[in-house]
Amino acid sequence: MYVFIFHVLAIKVGDVTDFTNFVNAVIDEASFDNCKGYIDRAKAASDAEVIFGGNCDKSVGYFVEPTVILTTNPKYESMAEEIFGPIITIYVYEDKDFVETLELCDSTSPYALTGAFFAYDLKAQRI
């Protein structure tokens, strides 16, 4: 997880006309408010926390800082819903729960947009 966060730290955010920026403002105020809502709820939740990012600024554009949410609940709302903003939610599963966690990725969203596995074990990555 720490390697992943290191890569998030390297993401450059700014104006769309600067092609060195990887993330720019979200499309409109409604999208900004939606992203901010997810972040605010994660900050207040007992089963989730914002471990990186979480800042939002709409003074010049609708900028949402790349944000990492860590949850202990595999069915936490941002695990099951497509946010359309620079927010990712991480659920760390126990090795013994791999099959059940894989099934969660397959069943959480009808659109299959929300699940991904990151693993050091090549066998796990092949499944």
Specify the residue positions occupied by each region the protein language model found.
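Conserved C-terminal structural/oligomerization subdomain of aldehyde/semialdehyde dehydrogenase
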Residues: K12, C56, F63-I127
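Conserved NAD(P)+-binding/catalytic subdomain of aldehyde/semialdehyde dehydrogenases
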Residues: M1
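Flexible, acidic loop-helix segments that line cofactor/substrate-binding pockets
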Residues: I5-G37, N55-F63, E77-G85
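Residues within well-ordered alpha-helical secondary structure of globular protein domains
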Residues: F6, R41, L104-S107
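Short secondary-structure junctions
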Residues: A44-N55
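Helical element adjacent to the flavin cofactor pocket in flavoenzyme catalytic cores
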Residues: G37-A45
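Aromatic/hydrophobic pocket-lining residues that form π-stacking "cages" and hydrophobic walls in ligand
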Residues: F4, Y38, Q125-I127
